[in-house]
């Protein structure tokens, strides 16, 4: 009796363009079908005939092979607020956009990830629902310092705290004393302490959070549906004041990496440069929306654009891009993330003329109050084409093989959205590059295709995003997670069940 044929032990992907170790090159990538890891990389396109008969082989030329993106700032909201998002839909949206790893924020789920018990509930909720790999952050809140070391042992990738009201009562803001306690606990742990860096400067203390939450606002005066009114209520001094507070405490834990999430105000950049020159271990991220949306373009009532810190002026956006494009070792903004923070459409209070609005028959027409609407941008899985569209406009990118700007742009995106985000969460030896020993997380990117963002291409749960209707350049053709094709733009989700893993090993 003839023995059944053996399953090939490897699969192979190749392209005339791939970003390997930060460099655009031709490449052939050999993947172990047993481990899902890359076993070899060659800097040329090797023909299929050079491999054993039956080896799965695809040459994706002229599309670009990129490392799967690592989105290090996503709110998946499960358990507790699954009507806002969930592991299943949120990770499908990620895979659609070439994101192969997401790190889930500690708030907007109930319970928040501020205790080991809360983390275990989240893990239980996530099991069997993730289409890509998922890691978790812990939170710092008043009174939970005693939980932090245990959360490190349980594998959280870092910790986040707010210096201003978070918008949800179960995740209160921390005081300077709370931060000191957290720093004491985490000073010698392999982790990162991150902050939502907005706080009320002393001059605003008399009106408190009413500046940003009351309706009508306590200050400044103006129509609540006007974006200019909202923007004036969250000035850049909120960010600079918070960063100064954090830096004043940094000496308490000099070996603990600090990180500013979703930096919006360009005025923060000189403060961070000075701190890094003085030896403070601090970095920052910015978001796709701060790099692509501008205050001048936001219509009255279009609360799809509401987030905190707010989207600022075009001039400010240019300042963020200028910093981002500095030499890799000089810039303080190291990473770009989505900060996907969705909600149900009704919480956006959109007027009926704005796409994504929610108004049942007989309801009073919403005015689009920027002060009452939920703050958060929905964009997980859209980041790569958003970045490519912006860079195409700014750098006049072409598809010519020798276009130096295109080469630089591809390499920059991999640094900002793959390699550096992986390093931020301690996955630099596993994710964010296409080299032997790493997970075969691959994004097949068509850098010339253009497409329109529609509800059918927003795979997150609620189809309410400021990007709806926009034409984007750059399309993810396929997404591979640990050596298996998960998503194809032509065929959808190839596997019938989610196979993403939870990243629970302790950071080292």
What name fits each language-model region?
Residues 2-67:
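Histidine-rich, glycine-flanked metal-binding segment
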Residues 50-51, 55-129:
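Metal-associated gating/positioning segment near the N- to mid-region
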Residues 108-131, 137-144, 150, 163-169:
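Active-site loop-to-helix "anion-binding N-cap" substructures in soluble metabolic enzymes
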Residues 116-132, 179-195, 382:
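Alpha-helix-loop-beta-strand connector modules within alpha/beta enzyme cores
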Residues 146-161, 165-336, 352-362, 397:
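Histidine/acidic residue-rich metal-binding segments in metalloenzymes
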Residues 228-255, 326, 343-445:
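His/Asp/Glu-enriched, well-ordered alpha-helical/loop segment
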Residues 272, 276, 334, 338, ...:
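Structural signature of the urease/amidohydrolase superfamily beta/alpha-barrel
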Residues 354-369, 436-503:
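C-terminal cap of metal-dependent C-N hydrolases
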């Amino acid at each position: 009796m003839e023995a059944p044929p053996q399953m090939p032990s490897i699969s192979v992907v190749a392209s005339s363009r791939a970003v390997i170790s930060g460099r655009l090159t031709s490449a052939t990538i050999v993947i172990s079908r047993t481990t899902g890891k890359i076993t070899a990389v060659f800097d040329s396109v090797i023909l299929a005939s050079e491999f054993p008969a039956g080896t799965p082989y695809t040459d994706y030329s002229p599309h670009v092979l990129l490392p799967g993106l690592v989105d290090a700032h996503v709110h998946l909201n499960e358990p507790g607020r699954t009507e806002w998002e969930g592991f299943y839909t949120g990770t499908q949206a990620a895979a659609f956009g070439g994101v192969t790893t997401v790190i889930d924020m500690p708030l907007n789920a109930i319970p928040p990830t501020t205790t080991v018990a809360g983390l275990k509930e989240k893990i239980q909720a996530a099991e069997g629902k993730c289409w890509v790999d998922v890691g978790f952050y812990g939170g710092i809140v008043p009174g939970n310092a005693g939980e932090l070391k245990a959360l490190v042992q349980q594998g959280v990738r870092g910790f986040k705290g707010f210096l201003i009201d978070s918008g949800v009562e179960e995740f209160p803001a921390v005081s300077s004393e709370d931060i000191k306690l957290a720093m004491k606990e985490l000073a010698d742990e392999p982790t990162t302490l991150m902050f939502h860096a907005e706080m009320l400067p002393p001059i605003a203390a008399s009106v408190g959070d009413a500046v940003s939450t009351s309706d009508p606002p306590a200050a400044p005066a103006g129509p609540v549906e006007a974006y200019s009114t909202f923007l004036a209520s969250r000035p850049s001094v909120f960010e600079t004041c918070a960063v100064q507070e954090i830096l004043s405490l940094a000496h308490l834990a000099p070996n603990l990496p600090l990180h500013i999430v979703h930096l919006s105000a360009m005025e923060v950049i000189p403060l961070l440069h000075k701190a890094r020159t003085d030896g403070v271990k601090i970095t920052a991220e910015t978001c796709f929306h701060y790099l692509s949306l501008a205050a001048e373009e936001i219509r009255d009532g279009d609360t799809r654009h509401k987030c905190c810190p707010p989207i600022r002026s075009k001039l400010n956006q240019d300042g963020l891009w200028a910093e981002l494009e500095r030499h890799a070792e000089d810039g303080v903004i190291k990473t770009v993330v989505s900060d996907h923070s969705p909600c149900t459409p009704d919480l956006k209070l959109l007027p009926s003329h704005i796409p994504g609005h929610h108004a049942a028959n007989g309801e009073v027409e919403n005015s689009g109050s920027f002060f009452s609407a939920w703050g958060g941008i929905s964009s997980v899985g859209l980041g790569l084409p958003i970045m490519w569209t912006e860079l195409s406009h700014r750098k006049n990118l072409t598809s010519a093989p020798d276009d130096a700007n295109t080469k630089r742009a591809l390499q920059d995106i991999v640094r900002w959205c793959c390699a550096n985000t992986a390093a931020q969460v301690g996955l630099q030896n596993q994710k964010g590059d296409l080299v032997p020993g790493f997970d075969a997380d691959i994004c097949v990117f068509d850098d010339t295709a253009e497409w329109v963002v529609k509800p059918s291409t927003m795979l997150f749960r609620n189809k309410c995003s400021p990007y709806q209707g926009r034409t984007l350049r750059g399309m993810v053709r396929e997404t591979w997670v640990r050596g298996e094709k998960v998503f194809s733009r032509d065929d959808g989700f190839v596997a019938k069940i989610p196979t993403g893993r939870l990243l629970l090993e302790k950071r080292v």
